[in-house]
Amino acid sequence: MQTACWVMVMMMVWITAPLSEGGKLNDVIRGLVPDDVTPQLILRSLFFHRPSDSVVRPTVPVRICYWKVCPPSP
């Protein structure tokens, strides 16, 4: 819990530090987002699928383990 609080405080300082130097909030937020992430790229990724997405993959059973206790494989 102490670590989580410390991380939150450091994130708040990291985000608000440029504001104390005369920066605008919009510039600070834009600095947190990578340059290659644009609204056009996000929309394109939502509407267009890669060719590998259309390939039907065989269903592979997934084993779910609880506390390192796994069911036997079939």
From Swiss-Prot:
Please list the GO terms describing molecular function: toxin activity
Signal sequence, start to end: 1-22
Could you name the domain of life of the organism this protein comes from?
Eukaryota
Q: Does the keyword ATP-binding apply?
A: no
Q: Which cysteines are joined by disulfide bonds?
A: 65-70
Chain positions found as 4-hydroxyproline: 71-72, 74
Gene Ontology terms: cellular component: extracellular region
Does the record's keyword annotation contain Disulfide bond?
A: yes
**Propeptide at which positions?**
23-57
Q: Which keywords annotate this record? A: D-amino acid, Disulfide bond, G-protein coupled receptor impairing toxin, Hydroxylation, Secreted, Signal, Toxin
Q: In which tissues is it expressed?
A: Expressed by the venom duct.
Modified residue D-tryptophan is at which positions?
67
Where, subcellularly, is it found?
Secreted
What functional role does this protein have? Moderately activates human somatostatin receptors (SSTR) with a preferential activation of SSTR1 and SSTR4. In vivo, does not cause behavioral changes in mice within a few minutes of intracranial injection, but causes a progressive loss of movement thereafter. Four to five hours after injection, mice recover, even with the highest dose tested. Shows antinociception and antihyperalgesia activities in two mouse models of acute pain, most probably by acting outside the central nervous system.
> Record's domain comment?
The cysteine framework is C-C.
**Remarks, miscellaneous:** This peptide is an evolutionarily optimized stable analog of somatostatin. In addition, it adopts nearly identical conformations as in the somatostatin drug analog Octreotide. As this drug, it contains a D-Trp at the same position, whose synthesis is a common strategy used for enhancing the metabolic stability of compounds in drug design. Consomatins evolved by gene duplication of a 'Somatostatin and related peptides (SSRP)' gene expressed in the snail neuroendocrine system.
UniProt lists the family membership as follows: Belongs to the conotoxin C superfamily. Consomatin family.
> What is the protein's given name?
Consomatin Gh1
Q: Which organism is it from?
A: Conus grahami (Cone snail)
Upper lineage is: Eukaryota, Metazoa, Spiralia, Lophotrochozoa, Mollusca
